[in-house]
């Protein structure tokens, strides 16, 4: 029988259907992960931070792309999210290269520097959050922020520009998914997501 970890060998990112879910704990959907991970530039042997890991979906795919010599820190302030992320990482991550941390992102102090940081949720004050982590970014490191609300989008762009990030980019992603209705399919729209990214000098 095919194992859970081998099922995603056919995919660039792990299918949403393979993740355990709990109501109230957010998950970055696979289409958004694909774009976000590309913008992050996750590579073999790199060091990456996932802020607001939720279900752990981004961390799982970071783990695969970073390989056995990579290192991922997945951070969340919600104990239920950390427990759920642990279940998903144990089932789906092919490498033991992820450290789960229960902490508020504004209070957490990393011991190392990062090649890229993903900010996916639980971020009420983006300008201060981005400023806090700038000293922990390597030269040329990337930050990617996912936003649903327009205010969060504006805060994300402002945060990167105030910290002198280069090549600040905004992509709006609108996904519709086909649902069987009788003999045909109806396209059901999901919420639009803004993917904001920038590079450290």
UniProtKB/Swiss-Prot annotation:
Q: Which Pfam families match?
A: Methyltransf_31
Q: Does the keyword Methyltransferase apply?
A: yes
Alphabetical GO biological process terms: anaerobic cobalamin biosynthetic process; methylation
Q: What is its EC number?
A: 2.1.1.196
Pathway it works in: Cofactor biosynthesis; adenosylcobalamin biosynthesis; cob(II)yrinate a,c-diamide from sirohydrochlorin (anaerobic route): step 8/10
What keyword terms does UniProt attach to this protein?
Answer: Cobalamin biosynthesis, Methyltransferase, S-adenosyl-L-methionine, Transferase
Report the domain of life of the source organism: Archaea
Write down the top EC class of this protein. transferase
Q: Where does S-adenosyl-L-methionine bind?
A: 28, 52-56, 76, 105
What Gene Ontology molecular function terms does this protein carry? cobalt-precorrin-6B C5-methyltransferase activity; protein methyltransferase activity
Q: Which residues form a coiled coil?
A: none
Regions that span the bilayer = none
Q: Provide the catalytic activity annotation.
A: Co-precorrin-6B + S-adenosyl-L-methionine = Co-precorrin-7 + S-adenosyl-L-homocysteine + CO2
Query: What disulfide bonds does the UniProt entry report for this chain?
Result: none
The cross-references to PANTHER family, in alphabetical order and at most eight, read:
COBALT-PRECORRIN-6B C(15)-METHYLTRANSFERASE (DECARBOXYLATING), COBALT-PRECORRIN-7 C(5)-METHYLTRANSFERASE
Q: Which family does it belong to?
A: Belongs to the methyltransferase superfamily. Archaeal-type CbiT family.
Supply the NCBIfam families for this chain. CbiT
Name of protein: Probable cobalt-precorrin-6B C(15)-methyltransferase (decarboxylating)
The protein's organism comes out as Thermoplasma volcanium (strain ATCC 51530 / DSM 4299 / JCM 9571 / NBRC 15438 / GSS1)
Q: What is the lineage of its organism?
A: Archaea, Methanobacteriati, Thermoplasmatota, Thermoplasmata, Thermoplasmatales
């Amino acid at each position: 029988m095919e194992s859970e970890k081998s099922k995603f060998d056919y995919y660039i990112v792990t299918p949403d259907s393979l993740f355990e879910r709990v109501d109230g704990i957010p998950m970055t959907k696979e289409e958004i992960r694909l774009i976000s991970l590309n913008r992050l530039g996750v590579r073999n042997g790199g060091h990456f931070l996932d802020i607001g890991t939720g279900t752990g979906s981004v961390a799982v795919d970071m783990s695969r792309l970073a390989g056995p010599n990579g290192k991922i820190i997945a951070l969340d302030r919600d104990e239920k999210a950390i427990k759920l992320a642990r279940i998903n990482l144990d089932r789906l991550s092919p490498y033991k290269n992820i450290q789960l941390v229960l902490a508020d992102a504004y209070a957490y102090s990393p011991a190392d520097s990062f090649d890229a940081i993903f900010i996916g949720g639980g971020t009420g004050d983006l300008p201060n959050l981005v400023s806090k982590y700038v000293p922990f970014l390597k030269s040329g490191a990337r930050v990617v922020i996912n936003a649903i609300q327009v205010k969060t989008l504006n805060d994300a762009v402002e945060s990167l520009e105030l910290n002198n990030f280069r090549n600040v980019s905004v992509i709006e992603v609108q996904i519709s998914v086909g649902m069987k209705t009788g003999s045909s399919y109806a396209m059901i729209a999901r919420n639009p997501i803004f993917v904001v990214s920038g590079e450290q000098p």
